[in-house]
Structures are given as structure tokens and as C-alpha cells.
Swiss-Prot record:
It comes from the Bacteria. This is Uncharacterized tRNA/rRNA methyltransferase HI_0424. GO terms for cellular component: cytosol. NCBIfam families: PRK10864.1 (NF008117). It holds the Pfam family SpoU_sub_bind. Transmembrane segments: none annotated. Gene3D superfamilies: 3.30.1330.30, 3.40.1280.10. Residues 1-61 are annotated as: Disordered. Its EC number is 2.1.1.-. It is an enzyme of class 2 (transferase).
Length: 351
């Protein structure tokens, strides 16, 4: 190999010193960011170049002109030519407020949906709801185990383009708000309540109603709903419709709520007056010895059983019936109202 082609290595003759970067080197140059200057210099209150209340619109403009041509003869008239010029320009117009159908995610629509929708959980409650009013279902959540049992429900939702989610038990507990979800939760439209006066306007020869006074416990309400459905009583009078349509009450009812219609009343005392005028026999549960034993009570064709978590003596009138469920009992508080409902409705059923 030729020695001239051999590489030669030379040591560096210069040394470099490490320099520290100060604060001024960390600052971003302003000359390269002109569009940020106004924003960070305290000029936010100045009028924006592009107004937010207006939108940019492409507009076609048509202009007509009349052009004259020089005549060949001075004495002749000047000929004219009509010219149409078409151009496209940009204009800013005020945004028009949308008046059509609201988007499903619009705040007004969300607020309305929350007022009209509720959640139902529990296997029996959800399956009974699907059997009676499947069109009211908006969305479904279910665990993997439950999804194997509700294939018909999932097929219906898929055919009608309604959403359903297969989630784990923890996620379902967060969605439903309880650990007692039973593996399934539905978002549904609330059932519509009817007015008591509208119900009484239709004459009936035979009827049985249950009136709830001061009943707020979801376990008690659910038990009464299930008992009424079991004995074929289809109407309940109440002044707290929201309590009857709560998710906890419907879970305890285990599907019985789907067979019950709520008759809404403004006040319980006025509702009892309306029922008396319509010819209904009002029956209260009595814990006093002055009450009539249940086996001695004669039921009329139109009956209203008044149930309460407390005493209903203040609502009773002399024409009402006070029924005793036992002749002697060491328990002064009596039975649960769901049990009272079962005893009274059984007598009505086998009258």
C-alpha cells in the first residue's frame, strides 16, 4: 500500500469549555411567534379579528355592466354591449340559531332525558319490564354471565339500534349505584302516572284500590307492589309517585311494578273524599279493640284499603271501616304494611 494513502490522525489543537445555559437562553424568541403576542401581552379584551358571533360564508356576486364601443362613423350612435361579471367573495354573516331537532347530546336534551328516564336493576324486574314495555328501554348494561341468559333482549336491542354494554360487576355497580344490581341494569323511560279524578270519571261496578299514606321506605313500597300484582289489584293511589317509581322499589317488587298503575293525588285527605263520593268503602287497619275483626267485615263491591307506616286514625271518618287483623297480639306496632296488604287482599280475592 502506498504510504501517501495511509490515514493520519492528529490530536485536537483546540479545547472547548462547557458553558451554562442561563435564563435568557430558555426564553422563546418572540419574533417567531407573532400570533401569540397579543394573547400573552394582556390584549385579550381587544376585539378579535374574527368575530365569534359571525360565520364565514362564500357568496357569489353578479355585476352587470354596459360597455360602449367606438363607432366607425362619427354621426352614428355608439353601440353598447351588456357584460355580466360573476365573482365569489367572502362575507361574514351573523350565525342563525338552530331551531330544528336537538342533538342527543345538547344540554337541553340531556336535562329533559334525565327528567323522563330512570334506571331499573334486578333480573326479575328487568325481564318483566322487557316483557311488558320493551319500547321504553333506552340502554342496557349486563355482566357476562347475565348476557348468556338475556339473548332475546340483546337481539331486540340490536334490531332496534339501541345500545347495550357487557361489563364487569364493578362497572355495573357504578352504573346502577348499588351492589344489588343482580347482573343487569336498564335505562328506561318512566311510566306515566294517571290522575285519580280521571280514573273516577269512568263508572265501575266492582273495583279494589290500595291507597298508600306516608309510605317512604323502598322495601315496603316494593313489597306492596308485588303483593298487589300477585292478587290482581292493578291500581294504587299515592301522592308520592317518585317513590313508587324508584329503582329500589322496583327491584324489591321483582317485576310486580309493571302490572300496577299509579293514580296520582295531590293530597291524601282530598283523595279519600273523592273516593267516598264515588261510592268506595274505605277500610283502615286498626290496632284498637274498637275495630271490627276482619272475619266480621263485609266487603262491598268497591273497596279501598288504606295502608300506612303510621296510624291512619286522623284520616278516618265515622263512615269508614276499622278492621282488626288479630284479636290479641304482644306486638303493639303491628305487621309490616306489605304483610297487611297480603292479608287484606286475600280476603278481597276470596270474598
Amino acid at each position: 500500500m502506498n504510504d501517501k494513502r495511509k490515514p493520519s490522525f492528529q490530536s485536537a489543537g483546540k479545547t472547548f469549555q462547557e458553558r451554562s445555559v442561563g435564563e435568557k437562553y430558555r426564553e422563546k424568541p418572540t419574533q417567531n411567534r407573532p400570533h401569540f403576542n397579543d394573547k400573552f401581552n394582556g390584549n385579550r379584551n381587544e376585539k378579535s379579528r374574527f368575530p365569534r358571533d359571525k360565520q364565514e360564508v362564500k357568496e357569489t356576486r353578479i355585476t352587470q355592466l354596459s360597455l360602449s364601443r367606438a363607432p366607425s362613423n362619427k354621426n352614428a350612435e355608439q353601440p353598447k354591449v351588456q357584460v355580466t361579471i360573476k365573482s365569489t367573495g367572502t362575507v361574514y354573516k351573523t350565525k342563525e340559531k338552530k331551531t330544528g331537532a336537538l342533538s342527543p347530546r345538547a344540554p337541553e336534551k340531556i336535562k329533559k332525558n334525565r327528567a323522563e328516564e330512570m334506571k331499573v336493576y334486578g333480573e326479575n324486574a328487568c325481564l318483566a319490564l322487557f316483557a311488558e314495555r320493551p319500547e321504553s328501554i333506552v340502554r342496557l348494561w349486563a355482566t357476562v354471565q347475565m348476557s348468556h341468559k338475556i339473548g332475546e333482549v340483546l337481539s331486540y336491542l340490536a334490531e332496534n339500534k339501541k345500545a347495550y354494554h357487557v361489563v364487569d360487576s364493578e362497572e355495573l355497580a357504578r352504573v346502577s349505584g348499588t351492589e344489588h344490581h343482580g347482573g343487569i341494569c336498564l335505562l328506561v323511560k318512566k311510566p306515566r302516572a294517571f290522575t285519580l279524578q280521571g280514573y273516577l270519571d269512568i263508572p265501575r261496578n266492582e273495583d279494589c284500590l290500595v291507597l298508600l299514606d306516608n309510605v317512604n321506605n323502598a322495601q315496603n313500597i316494593g313489597g306492596v307492589l308485588r303483593t298487589c300484582a300477585y292478587f290482581g289489584v292493578k291500581n294504587i293511589v299515592a301522592d308520592n309517585v317518585e317513590n313508587l317509581y324508584s329503582a329500589a322499589s322496583m327491584r324489591v317488587a321483582e317485576g310486580g311494578a309493571e302490572y300496577i298503575r299509579v293514580l296520582e293525588a295531590d293530597y291524601i285527605d282530598s283523595a279519600l273524599m273523592q273516593l267516598r263520593k264515588s261510592g268506595y268503602q274505605i277500610i283502615h287497619v286498626s290496632h284498637n279493640k274498637q275495630g271490627d275483626p276482619l272475619d266480621k267485615v263485609r266487603l262491598k263491591n268497591k273497596v279501598v284499603f288504606v295502608l300506612s307506616e303510621s296510624s291512619t286514625e286522623s284520616l278516618a271518618t265515622p263512615e269508614d271501616t276499622q278492621a282488626r287483623l288479630t284479636l290479641a297480639s304482644p306486638i303493639k306496632s303491628g305487621l309490616n304494611i306489605a304483610v297487611n296488604a297480603g292479608v287484606l287482599l286475600a280476603k278481597w280475592y276470596f270474598r
